[in-house]
């Protein structure tokens, strides 16, 4: 039964963006006002910390989104960094139907990067965010990311790193809401065959973003009971 729930949730995540993309192919997409992507700082801090268990997030650096990108509002001491990703953090290349999530201002995806990912992966998401906030479309974002990585302006991905996404208050897209608590594994150049070849919609783990590139992401679910609630302390 639980595997069936996984499949239905994944199919929803896959096909809702695809339907939106097909309906908008006839006209250029426009970004909503930047204010639609922002949150009150206190609320964003609480939501960011809900990405991981308290023993991690209470000691993590917290960054919040402003009109000029992500900025630290709390310096941690364990090397982890927690933020709330927006739709700007959509895949750079594949799956193609996910790329238009940059235009979805409702996305709120709390994530806590481990120390290695905080150094090697977070700058990539920050660059994507800044490019989108300057009005770049998904193709232009991909070009900007590729150019920056080639010039060494983004850290090279040196092996696998990971992040927590355990918040029960995550909203992965309009009409989808929260999904299963899961780990994001940043696995450069991985493709789906390297994690078992699981078909999309089947029980995880499987490749979710940008297979075969430096930015490949493997998603691994954890027990549903490990969800973390965003609560002020």
Describe each PLM feature range:
Residues 1-8:
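Bacterial N-terminal signal peptides that target proteins for export
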Residues 4, 20-22:
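Intrinsically disordered, low-complexity regulatory segments
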Residues 8-17:
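Bacterial N-terminal signal peptides
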Residues 23-233:
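Primary mode marks residue(s) on the alpha4-beta5-alpha5 output face of response regulator receiver
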């Amino acid at each position: 039964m639980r595997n069936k729930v996984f499949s239905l949730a994944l199919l929803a995540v896959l096909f809702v963006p695809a339907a939106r993309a097909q309906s908008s192919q006839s006209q250029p997409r426009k970004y909503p006002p930047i204010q639609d992507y922002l949150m009150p700082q206190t609320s964003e801090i609480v939501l960011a910390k809900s990405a991981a268990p308290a023993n991690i997030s209470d000691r993590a650096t917290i960054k919040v989104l402003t009109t000029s990108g992500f900025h630290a509002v709390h310096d941690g001491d364990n090397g982890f960094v927690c933020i709330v990703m927006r739709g700007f953090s959509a895949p750079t290349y594949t799956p193609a139907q996910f790329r238009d999530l940059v235009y979805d201002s409702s996305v709120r995806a709390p994530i806590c990067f481990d120390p290695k990912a905080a150094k090697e992966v977070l700058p990539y998401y920050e660059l994507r965010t800044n490019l989108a906030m300057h009005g770049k479309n998904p193709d232009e974002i991909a070009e900007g990311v590729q150019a920056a990585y080639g010039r060494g302006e983004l850290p090279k991905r040196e092996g696998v790193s990971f992040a927590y996404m355990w918040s029960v208050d995550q909203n992965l897209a309009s009409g989808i809401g929260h999904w299963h608590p899961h780990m994001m594994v940043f696995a450069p150049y991985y493709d789906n065959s390297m994690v078992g070849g699981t078909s999309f919609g089947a029980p995880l783990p499987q490749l979710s973003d940008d297979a075969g590139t430096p930015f490949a992401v493997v998603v691994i679910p954890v027990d549903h009971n490990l969800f973390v609630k965003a609560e002020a302390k």
